[in-house]
Amino acid sequence: MATASAMAGPSSETTSEEQLITQEPKEANSTTSQKQSKQRKRGRHGPRRCHSNCRGDSFATYFRRVLKQVHQGLSLSREAVSVMDSLVHDILDRIATEAGHLARSTKRQTITAWETRMAVRLLLPGQMGKLAESEGTKAVLRTSLYAIQQQRK
């Protein structure tokens, strides 16, 4: 207990000059570290924000857009977005892996639309696979037509 009271009040052994000397380097170090941290944060285009997923390969914005189109009053929690994001990543990874196996089995080095369609059919059962294939084909046609229209302008 004696040490706590000695730490709380200034001791008689140290003078006010010694206290100032010991405090000055701390203040100098803190201002130097603040300047260094500001210099590190500022890049070429100023400070940048890092969102929850800095990698940029998240589907979170698309989930919210689709939900807004389908059910306007609803929202998604972060946990729900995280679960859905991992689900989509997993399915796309499985489709790519299966399409790669199909391309290797036909002795090709390029994954084409045919391998992708067959991978979707193999991975998704029954009607779900057929629906996914038709929706994927429609999406590809839609983007192709849009690209052609943009070239004509």
Curated annotation (Swiss-Prot):
Main location: nucleus
Pfam families, A to Z: Histone
Further information: In contrast to other H2B histones, it does not contain the conserved residue in C-terminus that is the target of monoubiquitination. Has orthologs in primates, but not in rodents.
Span list, region Disordered: 1-54
Alphabetized GO MF terms: DNA binding; protein heterodimerization activity; structural constituent of chromatin
Presence of keyword Lipoprotein: no
Compositional bias annotation for Polar residues: 11-36
Keywords: Chromosome, DNA-binding, Membrane, Nucleosome core, Nucleus, Telomere
Tissue-by-tissue expression: Testis-specific (at protein level).
UniProt similarity note: Belongs to the histone H2B family.
Subunit structure: Can replace the conventional histone H2B in the nucleosome. The nucleosome is a histone octamer containing two molecules each of H2A, H2B, H3 and H4 assembled in one H3-H4 heterotetramer and two H2A-H2B heterodimers. The octamer wraps approximately 147 bp of DNA.
Composition bias, Basic residues: 37-52
Compartments where located: Nucleus membrane; Chromosome; Chromosome, Telomere
Name recorded for this polypeptide: Histone H2B type W-T
Superkingdom assignment: Eukaryota
CDD domains, per database record: HFD_H2B (cd22910)
GO (cellular component) term, any one: nucleosome
Function: Atypical histone H2B that can form nucleosomes structurally and dynamically indistinguishable from those containing conventional H2B. Nucleosomes wrap and compact DNA into chromatin, limiting DNA accessibility to the cellular machineries which require DNA as a template. Histones thereby play a central role in transcription regulation, DNA repair, DNA replication and chromosomal stability. DNA accessibility is regulated via a complex set of post-translational modifications of histones, also called histone code, and nucleosome remodeling.
InterPro entries for this protein: Histone-fold, Histone_H2A/H2B/H3, Histone_H2B
